[in-house]
Amino acid sequence: MSETAKRVALVGDASFYVGPSLARELARREHNLVLGDPAEGLVDELTALGVEVEAVLGVRNLADPESAQKLVAAARTRFGRIDSAAAFSGRVVTGKFLDSTLEDLHSVVQGCLEAPYHFLKAVVPVMVEQGDGQVLVMTSATAARPSRGASLYSSARAGATMMVKNVAAEVARNGVQVNAVGTNFMDFPEFLRASGANDPEIRARIEAAVPLGRLGTVEEFASFCMPFIDGTSKFTTGQFIAYAGGWA
């Protein structure tokens, strides 16, 4: 185990979506890091900032129960503790409820509900044992309101959000905070592809539906997440916050 006074943060997937940006923000705040499948060049970039990084490969699929367990084991072996942990997972299934299939349901539940379940089951017991810790689960703003054309996805995300609230209530007395933040209308490839927003006309219509009139960036989203995982604010738990430009 490394002898260090730095906090230790675990990012479940550092190759995708907000993962690399979260890792950068945490490194700037002098956190040592445990990263699942970090993006190419990211480890060198972060170690240049003076932090230690433990990369864990082959764990991107958090719906696999072993993925989160491997991340936690790596953190405990290298650093002896986990002060904060963040994870994003999901499988987007679109279409009307009446047109959906059981296969669609199983897919979205596995990606959006089982994955955060496995992550929480792996991370939270360590923090309970420590008597301290912060967990942030990324769900979706569609968990907060009905979403036309994404009923199964919205429903599964709502389930994950309520799971976070229940876990938070269960472990609050152990000094552990568990919160959820849900995005929508984000300027990153998966959303652009799923929504058709690579087409400028479609993007303009989508942006018009956002009260702030634009798409969000992963960099600003990572900054928003920091108080939930950087140890500076520990009086919030069991909350869901939509990060969607005022849409939810």
Predicted feature locations:
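Short, small/polar-rich loop/turn modules that mediate ligand/substrate recognition or access, typified
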Residues: A172, Q177, T236-G238
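Alpha-helical segment proximal to the catalytic Tyr-Lys
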Residues: P125, A169-E170, K234
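Catalytic loop of short-chain dehydrogenase/reductase
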Residues: L136-G159, V164-K165, A169-A172, F185
